[in-house]
């Protein structure tokens, strides 16, 4: 059995969690959650302890992203997946353009196409492992793409399409796995939305979005247009509740707490620049190793497209990546398997800010050892 191989302990990472999400949660933050005892968990989300926690998350995000004047931090339940439907109800007026370059970026396009009150979206697609670019288009009032395609480990720039303006069209960026680990200038985007279980080292179930003034206005305009919007998807309700440091319905309090702890750590460790420096160090280590390896190579061929926060590494046909992942898992190095629908002979490795760059280097040494002993 290959999973019976014992990797020498001096080669192993100190922490073996490399999953793309749910991702590594710092144990100190779990200890801090336990230490709250009876003061937070199990108390009303309409009272000060939980509302103060929501405020802590919102202010932490404002600090991390240097929130421009007029922008607001809005949050609600359901995760980033729910936000695609929220956007079809409350942000797209008539027609959207979508960049699709993997499983998750394509899902928003499918949601827009399925909405009978919207015109069929414009879709610009590229093969997995590469990325397309947005193009100004008449009749489009929302441009949407992912900052980081989690399934393939391709990152895309966040730049407003040339020839467009927030006066007539919004830029909606799915930053689920990129926010907090990739650089961004929020002045280039109207809604930058994400979830806590990636760079923010928490659990899932919430969506968080940074809204520009134009996006806030659009949400109000669409809501007033007479379009039927289910209460759970109503953005003005979420915006109003968020301004009061609460959510429309009961949030996952532990998720908020772990995110707040991570935000405190991020802001105390150099802010967004410090986090990008961490993910850059980790990804440089991974890709340099793969480029020098006799049996592995980066799946994403263009270095400019390679993600800082997720790495996909292909293996030569003679090496079974699934067997490598199985041995790693048996040795406590977990969740390096590739995205299931991509169907590649590869490993997928998360390098979010909570992951120590030294552990990424140790992972490469462990992989080399496993391949040598298969």
Curated annotation (Swiss-Prot):
Cellular component GO terms, alphabetical: cytoplasm
Record-level GO BP terms: glycine biosynthetic process, by transamination of glyoxylate; L-serine biosynthetic process; pyridoxine biosynthetic process
Major enzyme class: transferase
EC number per UniProt: 2.6.1.52
Location of the protein in the cell: Cytoplasm
Co-factor: note: Binds 1 pyridoxal phosphate per subunit.
Modified residues (N6-(pyridoxal phosphate)lysine): 198
Pathway stated in the Swiss-Prot or TrEMBL entry: Amino-acid biosynthesis; L-serine biosynthesis; L-serine from 3-phospho-D-glycerate: step 2/3; Cofactor biosynthesis; pyridoxine 5'-phosphate biosynthesis; pyridoxine 5'-phosphate from D-erythrose 4-phosphate: step 3/5
GO molecular function: alanine-glyoxylate transaminase activity; L-serine-pyruvate transaminase activity; O-phospho-L-serine:2-oxoglutarate aminotransferase activity; pyridoxal phosphate binding
Annotated catalysed reactions: O-phospho-L-serine + 2-oxoglutarate = 3-phosphooxypyruvate + L-glutamate; 4-(phosphooxy)-L-threonine + 2-oxoglutarate = (R)-3-hydroxy-2-oxo-4-phosphooxybutanoate + L-glutamate
Required co-factors: pyridoxal 5'-phosphate
Positions that bind L-glutamate: 46
Binding annotation for pyridoxal 5'-phosphate: 80-81, 104, 150, 174, 197, 249-250
Assembly information from the UniProt record: Homodimer.
Designated name of the protein: Phosphoserine aminotransferase
Native organism: Nocardioides sp. (strain ATCC BAA-499 / JS614)
